[in-house]
């Protein structure tokens, strides 16, 4: 008696379903590895369980992006939507602009100009001339600013020197007055010592004669 056809349907028991998923998943990945080795095939496999956890396998000789690109080219089906397509086009446009800027920069340096025609060389020369004029104008502006700052610093230096000189003169004037006062005091002391004793006492005791 032959075996009856087994109906394939969802396993209701969650535990049994998880066990069956793990076994079948491991079996599929094992078969993918075997066909890669035995047949030199390129295999890419992605599995998502009902929990959202991902398992994947890709042949060592390729990558998942390469497999997807190959699928898109072979099948003629577009895997990316318009948004991704626009983003890819924008990236390509920016790359081209960057390449063009690099070429122009080399031309400005005088490199790789043998391929330029007369008109292109004229445009390049005009651009360099305008650039030199702008640089010269900027240099002149910076030079004027430097000279102006030098004048300001020189004026401030003169003012500081004048203030310092005035302060030194005031200090010297005070010292001279102190020196003159010391000399005058010494002269008075000397004259006082040269006077007779009686005369020295008389100014200090004006009523002495009256008592005598």
From Swiss-Prot:
GO CC list: nucleus
Its GO biological process annotations read: positive regulation of transcription by RNA polymerase II
Q: In which tissues is it expressed?
A: Predominantly expressed in petals and stamens, less in carpels and sepals.
Domain of life of the organism encoding this protein:
Eukaryota
Q: Which SMART domains match?
A: MADS
Q: Pfam families given for it?
A: K-box, SRF-TF
Domain K-box, which positions? 84-170
Provide the alphabetized UniProt keywords: Activator, Developmental protein, DNA-binding, Nucleus, Transcription, Transcription regulation
What SUPFAM superfamilies does UniProt report for this protein, alphabetically? SRF-like (SSF55455)
The UniProt entry, under InterPro entries, shows: MADS-box/MEF2_TF (IPR050142), MEF2-like_N (IPR033896), TF_Kbox (IPR002487), TF_MADSbox (IPR002100), TF_MADSbox_sf (IPR036879)
Q: Which PROSITE patterns match?
A: K_BOX, MADS_BOX_1, MADS_BOX_2
Q: Name one GO molecular function term.
A: DNA-binding transcription factor activity
What is the recorded function of this protein according to its Swiss-Prot or TrEMBL entry? Transcription factor involved in the genetic control of flower development.
* UniProt protein name: Floral homeotic protein PMADS 2
Q: Please name the source species.
A: Petunia hybrida
Q: What is the lineage of its organism?
A: Eukaryota, Viridiplantae, Streptophyta, Embryophyta, Tracheophyta
């Amino acid at each position: 008696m032959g075996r009856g056809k087994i109906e394939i349907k969802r396993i209701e028991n969650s535990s049994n379903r998880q066990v069956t998923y793990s076994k079948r998943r491991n079996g599929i990945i094992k078969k993918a590895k075997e066909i890669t080795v035995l047949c030199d095939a390129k295999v890419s496999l992605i599995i998502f369980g009902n929990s959202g956890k991902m398992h994947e396998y890709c042949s060592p000789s390729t990558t998942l992006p390469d497999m997807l690109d190959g699928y898109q080219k072979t099948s003629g089906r577009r895997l990316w939507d318009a948004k991704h397509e626009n983003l890819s086009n924008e990236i390509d446009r920016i790359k081209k602009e960057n390449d063009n800027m690099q070429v122009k920069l080399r031309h400005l340096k005088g490199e790789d100009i043998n391929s330029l025609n007369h008109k292109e060389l004229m445009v390049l020369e005009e651009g360099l001339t305008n650039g030199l004029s702008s640089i010269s104008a900027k240099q002149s502006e910076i030079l004027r600013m430097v000279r102006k700052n030098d004048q300001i610093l020189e004026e401030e230096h003169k003012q500081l020197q004048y203030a310092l000189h005035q302060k030194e003169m005031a200090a010297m004037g005070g010292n001279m007055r102190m020196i003159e006062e010391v000399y005058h005091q010494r002269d008075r002391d000397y004259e006082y010592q040269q006077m007779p004793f009686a005369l020295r006492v008389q100014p200090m005791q004006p009523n002495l004669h009256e008592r005598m």
